Regions:
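Short, low-complexity cationic-aromatic patches
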Residues: 2-5, 20-21, 53, 67-72, ...
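Short acidic, S/G/P-rich loop/turn micro-motifs used as interaction or catalytic elements
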Residues: 18-19, 68-70, 83-86, 182-184
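Glycine/small-residue-rich interface belts in oligomeric ring/scaffold proteins
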Residues: 35-78
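Short strand-coil-strand connectors
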Residues: 54-56, 194-197
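Terminal, regulation- and interaction-focused segments at domain boundaries
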Residues: 2-21, 169-179
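Amphipathic alpha-helical segments
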Residues: 21-37, 90-93, 97, 182-196
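Vicinal oxygen chelate
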Residues: 85, 91-171, 175-183, 196-250
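Extracellular structured ligand-interaction cores
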Residues: 8-10, 48-50, 74-76, 173-175, ...
């Protein structure tokens, strides 16, 4: 089989409690910007609670540094493939199966391919391939089928939400900017050279700003009538532009 394109699946970032609360409580984000969910994910290996925003093929999540006992700036970038058996072979990487709990059982969720050792404390990355069994068994009231594409999984996620925006702005994530120390940047760039993802990731030296995610670029499904800026906490700013793009800075 020819190798499938490796795309962005999702990212997460840990923010301070004030920023997390401002994001969680924003009526604009939940009612206009994107499909939103606060959830606790129970896996066989761990559990965690965060807030999620779903696009068409990509999504992203935030963690509260106080609630999850994570450091502000902890970041992960998950890549994904859209076909069974499309996971690449990367020498030295570790492959395992991640499950997700539902109805008192752990359902095979996705296969994960991770660098060994992980990139750094507070910086993770992996490639994921959904299993056909996941959509066949998880929340079947939201649809039928055994699809493994990012779009099919996100469609199921959104279909079981209690409330969804009628016409959300968000289409997908198109790029990330990360600020990393030199050694972490070198390891991340080496990993990306092995993965060869079809998404733009830019790197900045650490300088005086926070570690990890500095900004996210988005493609929008519709344009705001004029440039729109929304702030969350002390330094998190989301800007929507009339050219159907947006940037969220941290």
């Amino acid at each position: 089989m020819a190798q499938s394109s490796i795309e962005l699946n999702h990212f997460y970032v840990t923010v301070d409690s004030a920023t997390y609360a401002a994001i969680e409580q924003s009526s604009f984000l939940k009612q206009e910007f994107a499909n939103f969910e606060k959830r606790t994910t129970v896996r066989a290996d761990r559990s965690y609670t965060g807030i999620y925003f779903y696009g068409t093929k990509t999504y992203f999540e935030f963690f509260d540094s106080a609630q999850e006992k994570r450091a502000v700036g902890e970041t992960a970038v998950a890549f994904g493939v859209d076909a069974v058996g499309a996971m690449p072979d990367i020498e030295g990487a570790h492959r395992d199966l991640i499950t997700r709990g539902w109805n008192d059982q752990q359902i095979p969720w996705f296969y994960r391919l991770s660098p060994v050792p992980q990139l750094a404390k507070g910086l993770e990355s992996w490639i994921m391939e959904y299993t056909p069994e996941f959509l066949a068994k998880w929340r079947p009231e939201g649809g039928v089928g055994q699809g493994v594409t990012r779009a099919e999984v996100l469609k199921r996620y959104k279909s079981v939400l209690a409330e969804t925006p009628a016409d959300a702005y968000l289409d997908d994530v198109t790029g990330l900017t990360l600020a990393l120390p030199a050694d972490e940047m070198e390891r991340m760039m080496h990993w990306m050279g092995q993965v060869k993802p079809a998404v733009t990731i830019r790197f900045l030296p650490m300088g005086q700003g926070p570690h990890g995610l500095r900004s996210v670029s988005f493609r929008l499904r519709k344009a705001p009538a004029e440039r729109m800026t929304v702030r969350f906490g002390a330094r998190s700013v989301l800007t929507l532009r009339p050219d159907k793009t947006a940037i969220w800075e941290f």
